[in-house]
């Protein structure tokens, strides 16, 4: 059997970085994709040091929809067995939509939605042909609710949830599984392109704990994964209550966190 590879976007930090270590620790060679080439090289070196796997880094700005064209074109001619695709890349924009920069919002859609679509479409034919493969889309508990002052971010996460659920059904008889991972607040640096800089959360699950759950549940073939009791409670309420009520609740919570 050929050696298995995992492709991970947003692999330079946070959950993506932790997922790189998880898949490398599981014996997967890894292709790591993100903008920060220096950080990617450090993650790749650590994967090799810890687990002895092969690594490849692809420095690309996924807000440019053509950034991965060369990489995608090469996929069809490679003999590598890409068993896992992790669509994790993303960033956030905080602020009322009418005041935020439209180009930044479009970049957000490109990073979180367009790149996931392009990569998923690129790897699926070979996975279907082998009757084996896993797609992991990293969404959010915000996939289930409207989020004032993060409207485009939450809409992108909702897209990933809906897309993943439809794709899982389409692929039911193929042996390819689709997992959508919906974490809440994690203890990780969150970089915004909206002028708020970086802020480190002090509460919530660690990126490492979240990644461990995502890794295990992906390989088990679980479809929707919401880690943690509080997050599952939020999702339950978001599905039970009217959208207007949920939006007001989320607005209040974010204000308490100093986000608005």
Where are the regions a protein language model picked out?
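Substrate-binding pocket helix/loop in short-chain dehydrogenase/reductase
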Residues: 96-98, 104-109
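Active-site helix of classical SDR
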Residues: 120, 156
């Amino acid at each position: 059997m050929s050696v298995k590879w995992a492709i991970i976007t947003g692999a330079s930090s946070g959950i993506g970085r932790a997922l790189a270590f998880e898949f490398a620790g599981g014996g997967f060679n890894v292709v790591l994709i993100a903008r920060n080439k220096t950080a990617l090289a450090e993650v790749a070196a650590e994967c090799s040091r810890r687990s002895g796997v092969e690594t490849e880094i692809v420095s690309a700005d996924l807000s440019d929809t053509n950034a991965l064209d060369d990489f995608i074109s090469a996929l069809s001619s490679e003999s590598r067995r890409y068993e896992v695709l992790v669509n994790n890349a993303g960033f956030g924009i905080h602020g009322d939509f009418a005041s935020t920069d439209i180009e930044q919002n479009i970049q957000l859609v490109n990073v979180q939605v367009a790149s996931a679509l392009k990569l998923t479409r690129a790897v699926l034919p070979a996975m279907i042909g082998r009757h084996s493969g896993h797609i992991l889309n990293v969404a959010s508990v915000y996939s289930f609710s409207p989020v004032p002052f993060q409207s485009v971010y939450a809409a992108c996460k909702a897209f990933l949830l809906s897309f993943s659920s439809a794709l899982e059904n389409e692929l039911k008889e193929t042996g390819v599984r689709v997992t959508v991972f919906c974490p809440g607040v994690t203890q990780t640096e969150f970089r915004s392109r909206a002028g708020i800089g970086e802020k480190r959360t002090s509460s919530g699950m660690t990126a490492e704990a979240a990644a461990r759950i995502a890794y295990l549940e992906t390989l088990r073939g679980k479809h929707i994964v919401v880690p943690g009791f509080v997050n599952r409670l939020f999702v339950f309420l978001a599905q039970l209550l009217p959208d207007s009520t949920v939006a007001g609740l989320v607005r209040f919570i974010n204000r308490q966190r100093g986000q608005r």
